[in-house]
Design a protein with these regions (language model features):
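Acidic/histidine-enriched, beta-strand-rich ligand/metal-binding domains
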Residues: 158-160, 192-195, 199
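A basic- and aromatic-enriched beta-loop-alpha substructure that forms the phosphate/nucleotide-
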Residues: 61, 69-78
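Short S/T/G/P-rich N-terminal loop/turn motif that feeds into the first structured element of a domain
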Residues: 1-57, 66-72, 83-159, 175-186, ...
């Protein structure tokens, strides 16, 4: 099994088509799951062009193996568009919470070392009536992750009406867990932990999960860079 996360500029018509009619496992050999989303800048104003960027696609996918992903790049129209962008191939490590599409993953498949790079993906199916409250608590956390010195790349993605995701690359597992558990200095460091307390008080979502991965290899470029994943230490 292999996971991958993709970022690419595909144009609005292609993005809308993928959001409305994503590739299905039965139609793509070796594809197990695929979550297509529109890119979003973390911490962007609620009403702004940066909040939902249809021309920038973010895709989380699960494959039988690397050959299936390579075949998708060559043979599927969306795959060929994604191949022009950037992606990272991932080994699944841990899961917190549950979203039906990824509930088959074990809570722990392997452990990361404190000093090694990790990738974190959150995926939520939001309760629409809780959306204003989710935004109020979530935007400060978005800014915290976006500006964290230990995160080399951090962004969000959405698929209307209710799917919301974040994707972040961390220089170390230690840096990521320090942010999650509020061990960073100052009031900013408490934002994520505070939002989790509010989540426990009254859930924002129908479903929510956090997935942790080990980055295996990085391909292509995004925003002029091809070195978002730190080297193994």
């Amino acid at each position: 099994m292999l996971h991958s996360f993709h970022l690419a500029r595909v144009g609005v018509p292609a993005a809308v088509g993928a959001l409305l009619r994503p590739p299905s496992p039965g139609a793509v050999t070796g594809l197990r799951r695929l979550e297509p989303m529109a890119g979003m800048r973390l911490g962007a104003p609620v009403v702004s062009a940066a909040r939902m960027q249809l021309h920038r696609m973010a895709v989380l996918a699960e494959w039988d193996d690397a050959d299936a992903l390579d075949c998708f790049f060559k043979e599927h129209p969306l795959g060929r568009r994604l191949a022009t962008g950037w992606h990272v191939r991932l080994q699944f490590l841990r899961r917190w919470g549950s979203v039906a599409a990824f509930a088959h993953l074990p809570q722990e498949a392997a452990r990361s070392r404190p000093g090694e790079p990790v990738v974190a993906v959150t995926l939520a199916r939001t309760r629409l009536l809780e959306l204003p409250r989710f935004i109020r608590w979530g935007r400060p956390v978005e800014e915290q992750v976006r500006d964290h010195p230990g995160a080399t790349l951090a962004l969000a993605a959405v698929r209307p009406p209710r799917t919301v995701s974040t994707f972040s690359v961390w220089e170390s597992s230690r840096a990521m867990t320090g942010m999650v558990w509020g061990r960073d200095a100052g009031p900013v460091g408490e934002r994520h932990a505070g939002a989790m307390v509010e989540l426990e008080r009254r859930d924002f979502h129908h479903e929510f999960t956090t997935l942790r991965f080990r980055p295996l290899s990085e391909h292509g470029s995004w925003e002029g860079r091809s070195d978002w994943v730190p080297p193994l230490r």
